[in-house]
C-alpha cells in the first residue's frame, strides 16, 4: 500500500484549554520502606513533558503543522518548564499568567514500567476572567483551519460556549475533547470526541453498536453538533454524522502499554488533518492510526510523521495493503482527492503464479492505484468446489498485498463482488480471461458512474487448476 500523508505544514491549529505539566520520576525498586509498607524507589531519571491541552498542541506540532497554544498558568517553575519544552518542539505559546494560582502539575513515580503513585499539584482556575482567552482566539481565527478546545475541567474553558460562538462566526471548525456529563456546554460544536465511558455517562450503557449509533445520533441532534466521534479503546472508534452511514474503524493498536494522552493524540491528529484540507472521514482514518501507535508508548507521547505513515500503511503482520471495506473507502476517497485514477479487479488468486503477477502488473499500469478484491474461503468453495481454496484467505491476501503492483487488498463474502464494486465505484474495472465486458460483475454500476470496464488476457498455460493437476499427477508418479 502506498500512502501519501496530508500536507500538514500548511495546516494552522489553535489549541485552547487546560494546560499542565507531567513530571515523571523513574528508578529501581528493591526493598520495602521500614517506615511504612510501601516500596522505596531510588530515583535516577526525571522527565518533564507537556500534558493536557499542551500535549494536544505537541501532537499537532509533531506532524509539522503550525500549533498555537493558549491556556492558564501560574508564574512559577512549572510554567517556565512548559514554555521551554513547547518552544523546543515548535509550539507557539501564548499563556495567560495567573499569579494567584500554581501551574497544574501531575507527578508520577514509576518503577519497572509500573506507575506506583501520582501526585497532583493544582488549584482550579474557575472564576478567572476569560476575556484574555477570547482576545487570543479572535486574533487567530483568520489564520487557522481548526480550533481545538481541550477540556480537563480545570477552569480554562469556563466560557466554552462563547469560544464556540466566536469560531462559528468565523467559519472555523471547533473540535472538543469533552469532560463531564454536561454536554449542553458544547452545543453547536463541529465535533465532540468522547471516549466510550464519557459517552455512556451521558446517554446510558450501550450493549450493542446499534445502540451507540442510535443514541449518538440523538445526542448530535439534541446539541446541534455536526458530528460525533466515539473512541472505543480496543474496539476502535465510531464516527457519526447526520445523513451519513456510521463509520466504524477497528483499532490498529498492536500492544497497549499506556493510554495516557491517547485522546490528546486523536483530537490533535484530527485537527491537523482537517486544517490541511482533508475530509472528516480521512481525518478519522489518520487519527485512528495515530492512536494505535501512541498507546504502545509509555506516558504522554506524540506521533511522528514517519510513525504515522508506517501505521497507515499497515504492518507486515497485517498484510501491508490488506484493508477492511470501510478503510478502503477512505483510502479511495483520499486518492480521488489527489486526482489519482483507481483501478479495481477481483478473483480467487488461490495459488499465485506468473500469469497472476503479469496480469496485475498490467492492470496497475492502467491507473495510479490498484485494488484487488478477493473471494473469501466460503465464496471460493461455492465457486470452485469443496477442495478449494488451497490457501486460506488471510494467506492469499498477504501474498497479494506484498506485490509491488497492488495498493489495496479487500475481501468479499458474496459469490460476486458486485456490491463491493458498487460501493467503491472504481474509475476502471478490469477482469482477466475471455469475458465480455457486460458479463463482468459490477460493470453496470461502473458504467453508470462514468467509469470504464476492460478485459485483459492471462498468460497462456498459466492457471491454478493446471498447477493443482500437475501436482496431483506428480504425486501419482
Curated annotation (Swiss-Prot):
InterPro entries registered for this protein in UniProt: Bifunc_HldE, Carboh/pur_kinase_PfkB_CS, Cyt_trans-like, PfkB_dom, RfaE_dom_I, RfaE_dom_II, Ribokinase-like, Rossmann-like_a/b/a_fold
Region (Ribokinase): 1-318
Gene Ontology cellular-component terms listed: cytosol
Pathway note: Nucleotide-sugar biosynthesis; ADP-L-glycero-beta-D-manno-heptose biosynthesis; ADP-L-glycero-beta-D-manno-heptose from D-glycero-beta-D-manno-heptose 7-phosphate: step 1/4; Nucleotide-sugar biosynthesis; ADP-L-glycero-beta-D-manno-heptose biosynthesis; ADP-L-glycero-beta-D-manno-heptose from D-glycero-beta-D-manno-heptose 7-phosphate: step 3/4
Superkingdom of source: Bacteria
Gene3D superfamilies hit by this protein: 3.40.1190.20, HUPs
An MF annotation (GO) of this entry: heptose 7-phosphate kinase activity
Residues covered by region (Cytidylyltransferase): 344-477
Enzyme class: transferase
Modified-residue entries (N6-acetyllysine), positions: 179
UniProt catalytic activity: D-glycero-beta-D-manno-heptose 7-phosphate + ATP = D-glycero-beta-D-manno-heptose 1,7-bisphosphate + ADP + H(+); D-glycero-beta-D-manno-heptose 1-phosphate + ATP + H(+) = ADP-D-glycero-beta-D-manno-heptose + diphosphate
A Gene Ontology biological process term: ADP-L-glycero-beta-D-manno-heptose biosynthetic process
Leader peptide range in chain numbering: none
Residues involved in ATP binding: 195-198
Keyword annotations: Acetylation, ATP-binding, Carbohydrate metabolism, Kinase, Multifunctional enzyme, Nucleotide-binding, Nucleotidyltransferase, Transferase
EC assignment: 2.7.1.167, 2.7.7.70
Alphabetical list of NCBIfam families matching this protein: cyt_tran_rel, PRK11316.1, rfaE_dom_I, rfaE_dom_II
Function: Catalyzes the ADP transfer from ATP to D-glycero-beta-D-manno-heptose 1-phosphate, yielding ADP-D-glycero-beta-D-manno-heptose.
Assembly and binders: Homodimer.
Entry's family note: In the N-terminal section; belongs to the carbohydrate kinase PfkB family. In the C-terminal section; belongs to the cytidylyltransferase family.
Protein name: Bifunctional protein HldE
Source organism of this protein record: Shigella boydii serotype 18 (strain CDC 3083-94 / BS512)
Amino acid at each position: 500500500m502506498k500512502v501519501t500523508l496530508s500536507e500538514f505544514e500548511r495546516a494552522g491549529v489553535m489549541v485552547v484549554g487546560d494546560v499542565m505539566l507531567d513530571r515523571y520520576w523513574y528508578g529501581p525498586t528493591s526493598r520495602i520502606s521500614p517506615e511504612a509498607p510501601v516500596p522505596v524507589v531510588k530515583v535516577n531519571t526525571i522527565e518533564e513533558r507537556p500534558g493536557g491541552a499542551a500535549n494536544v498542541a505537541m501532537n499537532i506540532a509533531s506532524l509539522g503543522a503550525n500549533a498555537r497554544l493558549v491556556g492558564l498558568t501560574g508564574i512559577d517553575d512549572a510554567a517556565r518548564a512548559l514554555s521551554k519544552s513547547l518552544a523546543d518542539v515548535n509550539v507557539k505559546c501564548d499563556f495567560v499568567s495567573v499569579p494567584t494560582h500554581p501551574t497544574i502539575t501531575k507527578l508520577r513515580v514509576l518503577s519497572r514500567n509500573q506507575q506506583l503513585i501520582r501526585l497532583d499539584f493544582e488549584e482550579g482556575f474557575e472564576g478567572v476572567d476569560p476575556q484574555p482567552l477570547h482576545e487570543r482566539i479572535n486574533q487567530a481565527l483568520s489564520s487557522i483551519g481548526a480550533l481545538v478546545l481541550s477540556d480537563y475541567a480545570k477552569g480554562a474553558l469556563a466560557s466554552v460556549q462563547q469560544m464556540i460562538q466566536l469560531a462559528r462566526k468565523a467559519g472555523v471548525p471547533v473540535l472538543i475533547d469533552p469532560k463531564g456529563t454536561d454536554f449542553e456546554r458544547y452545543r453547536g460544536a463541529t465535533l465532540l470526541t468522547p471516549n466510550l465511558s464519557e459517552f455512556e455517562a451521558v446517554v446510558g450503557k450501550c450493549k450493542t453498536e446499534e445502540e451507540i449509533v442510535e443514541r449518538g445520533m440523538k445526542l448530535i441532534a439534541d446539541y446541534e453538533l455536526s458530528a460525533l466521534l466515539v473512541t472505543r479503546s480496543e474496539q476502535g472508534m465510531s464516527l457519526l454524522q447526520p445523513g451519513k452511514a456510521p463509520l466504524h474503524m477497528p483499532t490498529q493498536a498492536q500492544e497497549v502499554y499506556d493510554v495516557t494522552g491517547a485522546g490528546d493524540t486523536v483530537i490533535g491528529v484530527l485537527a491537523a488533518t482537517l486544517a490541511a484540507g482533508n475530509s472528516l472521514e480521512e481525518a478519522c482514518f489518520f487519527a485512528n492510526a495515530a492512536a494505535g501507535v501512541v498507546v504502545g508508548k509509555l506516558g504522554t507521547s506524540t506521533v511522528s510523521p514517519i510513525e504515522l505513515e508506517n501505521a497507515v500503511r499497515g504492518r507486515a503482520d497485517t498484510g501491508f495493503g490488506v484493508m477492511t471495506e470501510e478503510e478502503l473507502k477512505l483510502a479511495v476517497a483520499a486518492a480521488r482527492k489527489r486526482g489519482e485514477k483507481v483501478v479495481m479487479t477481483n478473483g480467487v488468486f488461490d495459488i499465485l503464479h506468473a500469469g497472476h503477477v503479469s496480469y496485475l502488473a498490467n492492470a496497475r499500469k492502467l491507473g495510479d492505484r490498484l485494488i484487488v478484491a478477493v473471494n473469501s474461503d466460503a465464496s471460493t468453495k461455492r465457486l470452485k468446489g469443496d477442495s478449494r481454496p488451497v490457501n486460506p484467505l488471510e494467506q492469499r491476501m498477504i501474498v497479494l498485498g506484498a506485490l509491488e503492483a497492488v495498493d489495496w487488498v479487500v475481501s468479499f463474502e458474496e459469490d460476486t463482488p458486485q456490491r463491493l464494486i458498487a460501493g467503491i465505484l472504481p474509475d476502471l474495472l478490469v477482469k482477466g480471461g475471455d469475458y465480455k465486458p457486460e458479463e463482468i460483475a459490477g460493470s453496470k454500476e461502473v458504467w453508470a458512474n462514468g467509469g470504464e470496464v476492460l478485459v485483459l488476457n492471462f498468460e497462456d498455460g498459466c492457471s491454478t487448476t493446471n498447477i493443482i493437476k500437475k501436482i496431483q499427477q506428480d504425486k501419482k508418479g
